[in-house]
Amino acid sequence: MCHGRIAPKSTSVFAVASVGHGVFLPLVILCTLLGDGLASVCPLPPEPENGGYICHPRPCRDPLTAGSVIEYLCAEGYMLKGDYKYLTCKNGEWKPAMEISCRLNEDKDTHTSLGVPTLSIVASTASSVALILLLVVLFVLLQPKLKSFHHSRRDQGVSGDQVSIMVDGVQVALPSYEEAVYGSSGHCVPPADPRVQIVLSEGSGPSGRSVPREQQLPDQGACSSAGGEDEAPGQSGLCEAWGSRASETVMVHQATTSSWVAGSGNRQLAHKETADSENSDIQSLLSLTSEEYTDDIPLLKEA
C-alpha cells in the first residue's frame, strides 16, 4: 500500500511461489509412499540351528513384503520346539513373535531300537512259514513215489526175495514165501484126488489098472526129487502127506488087484505075470513113503 493505494504484486515473486508450490506437493506424496513402503517390508526371519525355512508362495521374494508367509523345517533327527511353525509378515514384523529352535528327537532312537528286533522277528516268522510250506510241498510230491517203493518192497518180499535180519550181531537170511511153503527145491505138485483114482481103479478092467499107477509115479517122483539133505521142513511135511495119500491109493489098488487076481485064478499065465510085476512096482513105490505112515499100510492090506 502506498499513499493509500495498493501496490500491485511483482510477477517474479508470484512465479517463484507458483513453482515452489508445484514441486513441494509431489515431494510430499513421494515421501508418504516411500514411508508406507518401508514400513511394509519385513526383515529376514531368524534361521534356527539344525533347521531352515521356506516361503509361501515360492520362491522367496526379496524383500519380504507384507503378507509373506514362511514355514520352519528342521533337519532329520530334530524337531521344532513348539507346535506352531508358520510366521506371517505384518507391518514390518513377523507375527506371531516367538523363538524358533530345533531340538534332538529322542523318540526316534527308541523307535529305531525297537524296529530292529521287530524286523528280525518278522523275518524269522516268514522264513519258518516258507520252510513249512516247502516241506509240505515236498511231502505231497514224494508221497506217490514212497507208496510205489513200499509196494515194490512188499511185492519183492512175497515174490521170493530173501530178507535178512540181525540176530546178536549176525545177519540171518529169512526164507521167502515160496521157500517157507514149498521148500528150497521149488514147487511140489499135489497129486490128483485119490477118490477119483479109486473110481478109475474099480471101474477099469485088467488093461486099465496101469492108469492110476502111471499117475502116481510122477507125483511120487516129484516129491522124491525135492527130498534130500537140503529139503525144507515145510516141503518135507507136505510131500510126506501127499506120499501118504499116494500110498493109500496104491494100497486100495493093491487090495482091488489082489481080489481080482483071486477071482480069476484060472486065467492065463501072462495075466498073472503082469499082476506080479504090477505088485512089485507098487512095493517099490511104498518103500519111498514116509516112515511115520508105515503103520497104516498093514491095515490097508488087511482091508
Swiss-Prot record:
Residue ranges, annotated region (Disordered): 199-237, 263-282
Topology relative to the membrane: Single-pass type I membrane protein
SMART domains linked: CCP
Induction: Up-regulated by chemotherapeutic DNA-damaging agents and by p53/TP53 and/or by p73/TP73 in response to cytotoxic insults. Up-regulated by lipopolysaccharide (LPS) in monocytic THP1 cells. Up-regulated in umbilical vein endothelial cells (HUVECs) cultured in THP1 monocyte LPS-induced medium.
Main location: membrane
Alphabetical keyword list: Disulfide bond, Membrane, Signal, Sushi, Transmembrane, Transmembrane helix, Tumor suppressor
All ranges on the Cytoplasmic side of the membrane: 142-303
Gene Ontology, cellular component aspect: membrane
PROSITE patterns given in the database record: SUSHI
Membrane side Extracellular: residue ranges: 40-120
CDD domains, alphabetized: CCP
Subcellular location field: Membrane
GO BP term, pick one: DNA damage response
Family matches, as Pfam families: Sushi (PF00084)
Record's function text: May play a role in growth-suppressive activity and cell death. May be involved in the production of chemokine molecules in umbilical vein endothelial cells (HUVECs) cultured in THP1 monocyte LPS-induced medium. Plays a role in preventing tumor onset.
Protein name: Sushi domain-containing protein 6
Originating species: Homo sapiens
